[in-house]
A protein has these predicted regions:
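An anion/pyrophosphate-binding glycine-rich loop and adjacent beta-alpha core
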Residues: 146, 153-199, 323-325, 329-460, ...
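Conserved N-terminal/central alpha/beta ligand/cofactor-binding core
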Residues: 2-6, 11, 52-239, 291-295, ...
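Extreme N-terminal leader/targeting segments of oxidoreductases
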Residues: 1-24, 42, 227, 559-562, ...
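N-terminal Rossmann-like FAD-binding beta1-loop-alpha1 element of flavoenzymes
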Residues: 24-49
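Helical element adjacent to the flavin cofactor pocket in flavoenzyme catalytic cores
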Residues: 206-275, 323
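A glycine-rich dinucleotide-binding beta-alpha-beta segment and adjacent secondary-structure elements
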Residues: 248, 256, 464-558, 562
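Glycine-rich loop(s) and the adjacent beta-strand/alpha-helix scaffold that form part
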Residues: 216-223, 235, 264-347, 570, ...
Length: 593
């Protein structure tokens, strides 16, 4: 049979060759996938979401729920108008040439439109902007000290009805009734500095009381965002199949992706996607073999955490299935050594804890294996983690590194989840004036009465740690960090101590002193399928694989190796999900003309 005949047969495959047909098949139920499905539906196409896990929400449900959208409608409503050309220049600078101008322009131009579409599409899609959480490089041209992180209000999960049980729960469950609105957390960290911090503590107690008395099941941040998106899907009758992993992409003889095989109830289901398939299935967060292959420095993390432990905060179901499926049909991949890095503490039970506000508190510094500071401790977490990786490659142990502080800081600031208030029996977090014995027994936290003794316990040169402490204290007393400029950026100041002239600098006082071990954690991988400005997946020669789109952590990030501001993972995921759906709709219209 001639190739022309083969193509004719392939082109005229009847619906009988498939078990199910849709215009747009979306693989993955996180923020990017749900946005793609809603945008497809809004463009007059029928969409289906298939989700590998028994739970929906993906890494978005586990996240802080912020969405980085410069020029968002909520900013405009507040009278804050951003120069989008400046935002493009900001992104171009921080991505350092790794990302095409076309992709950057697409993000900057389409992100506000995406958010406007969602707000108009459903009563559940409500977004708010509260200024103050600066971009991560606010001093750069186009950066913003007021920030562009957009959030959703809290929601009572009871409105989900039976679907509540299908929402992916946070990795660390808070006590019933405890939830933080975006600005609550910052004030909570100031519980010993001002009455606003104490007011948040009282608010949390009241929320616990309400939950027990009235049955409230309130959720905020990522949980609220994904609950709202699920409600919007229901409002528009967009179906979603849970426990339905995509196992294979289907192509025609020209290499166009025309559908996928999905396993459902133990059976393979062939689904035809008339317009296209959108891969929004997340990264390969928990495929440690694959990750170690691309970043050998993670072997050191595994040595510290334990070979059987996993240091990613990403969706437990993220194993790279969508990326591999794309590769099998010819897709190129980029940035597989990258992740949304986050310095963290790893407790003996394998539980990871963010190191965020601790790195911004004033009386502390971080040292490497030589006992020296190596970065502005308050730097954005991607920068801090890259410094750890680069130091390790250079032969200086920075995985782990150690945060050095004093007992006064422990009594004054939230450190390692410890709340600096009098001992509260049966409290859900550590309280009281003593460093928990379990911390000291774990080996993750070291205690000593002098810097020299502490140095011995963490394996750094005693004389050098003393010299580093003396140098830091001298700079802190003068009010400026001449070595690393800690405290110069509005971003540094966010979780600092607002009662100090420099919120991020204060000399360490008397002992005992403490060292907290820091390793590499992450919020998920950020490398994957190579895509263009229309979210189309590309081959190695940058030609387009027709019918295949991707967004979110399944792609090589539009942020490159950087991080523009809080929400710079979810913002692009949702935006390029929207872009993909709009492009499919446009292509479908062209075909029918």
């Amino acid at each position: 049979m001639s190739s022309e005949a083969d193509r004719a047969i392939q082109a005229n495959l009847s619906s009988e060759a498939y078990d199910h047909e849709v215009d747009v098949l979306v693989v993955g139920s996180g923020g990017g996938g749900m946005t793609a499905a809603l945008a497809a539906k809004g463009s007059g196409l029928d969409a289906l979401i298939v989700e590998k896990s028994a739970k929906f929400g993906g890494s978005t449900a586990l996240s802080g729920g912020g969405v980085w959208i410069p020029g968002a409608p909520s900013q405009v409503r507040a009278g804050y108008h951003i120069d989008l050309n400046g935002v493009f220049e900001y992104l171009k600078q921080i991505t350092g040439g790794l990302v095409s101008d076309a992709r950057l322009h697409a993000y900057v131009d389409e992100a506000p439109k995406m958010m406007d579409f969602l707000e108009r599409s459903s009563k559940w899609m409500q977004f708010v902007w509260k200024p103050g959480y600066a971009d991560y490089y606010p001093e750069l041209p186009g950066g913003s000290e007021r920030g562009s992180t957009i959030n959703v209000p809290e929601i009572d999960l009871r409105v989900l009805g039976p679907e509540e049980q299908n929402l992916l729960a946070p990795l660390a469950l808070a006590p019933r009734g405890i939830w933080f609105a975006p600005k609550d957390l910052r004030l909570f960290y100031q519980v010993r500095q001002n009455w606003r911090g104490k007011a948040v503590l009282l608010k949390l107690i009241w929320r616990m009381v309400r939950a027990h008395v009235f049955g409230d099941r309130m959720a905020a941040i990522g949980q609220s965002l994904m609950a709202r998106m699920r409600l919007a899907l229901g409002e528009h009758n967009v179906p979603m199949w849970l426990s339905a992993p995509m196992t294979e992409l289907i192509t025609d003889l020209d290499g166009r992706v025309v559908g996928a095989v999905v396993e459902r109830d133990g059976k393979p289901i062939r689904i035809r996607a008339r317009g296209g398939v959108v891969i929004a299935s997340g990264g390969f967060d928990h495929d440690m073999t694959w990750r170690l292959e691309h970043l050998p420095e993670l072997n050191r993390v595994q040595e510290i955490a334990g070979s059987g432990k996993d240091w990613s905060f990403g969706n437990p179901a993220s194993m790279g299935d969508g990326i591999r499926a794309g590769e099998k049909v010819g897709a190129a991949v980029d940035l597989l050594d990258e992740a949304w890095w986050f310095p963290a503490m790893c407790w003996p039970d394998g539980r990871l804890q963010f190191m965020l506000n601790e790195r911004m508190m004033p009386a502390q510094f971080v040292v490497n294996g030589e006992g020296k500071r190596f970065i502005n401790e308050a730097a954005p977490y991607m920068d801090f983690a890259h410094a750890m990786i680069e130091g390790q490659r250079a032969g200086v142990e920075t995985i782990p590194c150690w945060l050095i502080t004093d007992i006064r800081s422990f009594h004054k600031y939230v450190v390692g989840g410890h709340l600096p208030i009098p001992k509260v029996p049966f409290a859900p977090v550590p309280t009281g004036r003593k460093v928990p014995k379990a911390w000291l027994d774990s080996g993750i936290v070291k205690e000593a009465n002098s810097f020299e003794e502490l140095a011995t316990k963490i394996g750094v040169p005693p004389a050098q740690l003393r010299a580093t402490a003396d140098r830091f204290n001298k700079l802190a007393a003068g009010g400026h960090d001449d070595d690393f400029n800690r405290g110069d950026s509005a971003y540094d100041n966010y979780y600092g101590d607002p009662t100090l002239p420099n919120p991020n600098l204060l000399p360490l006082g008397k002992g005992p002193y403490y060292a907290f071990q820091i390793i590499l954690g992450d919020l998920g991988t950020s490398g994957g399928l190579r895509t263009d400005e229309h979210a189309r997946v590309l081959r190695e020669d940058d030609t387009v694989i027709d019918g295949l789109y991707a967004t979110g952590n399944a792609t090589a990030a539009v942020m490159g190796r950087s991080y523009a501001g809080a929400g710079a993972t979810i913002g692009p995921a949702m935006t390029f999900g929207y872009v993909a759906a709009k492009h499919i709709a446009h292509q479908s219209q062209e075909v029918t003309k």
